[in-house]
Amino acid sequence: PQVGLIPFPRV
């Protein structure tokens, strides 16, 4: 999911 402005791969 996209967190803020930078898309972080949440695992």
Swiss-Prot record:
Keywords, comma-separated and alphabetical: Amidation, Neuropeptide, Secreted
Locate the Valine amide modifications and list their residues.
Answer: 11
Q: Name one GO cellular component term.
A: extracellular region
What GO terms in the biological process aspect are recorded for it?
A: neuropeptide signaling pathway
Q: Which domain of life is it from?
A: Eukaryota
Q: What is its main location?
A: secreted
Where does the record say this protein resides? Secreted
Family the UniProt entry places it in: Belongs to the periviscerokinin family.
Protein purpose: Mediates visceral muscle contractile activity (myotropic activity).
Q: Please give the name of this protein.
A: Periviscerokinin-3
Native organism is: Polyphaga aegyptiaca
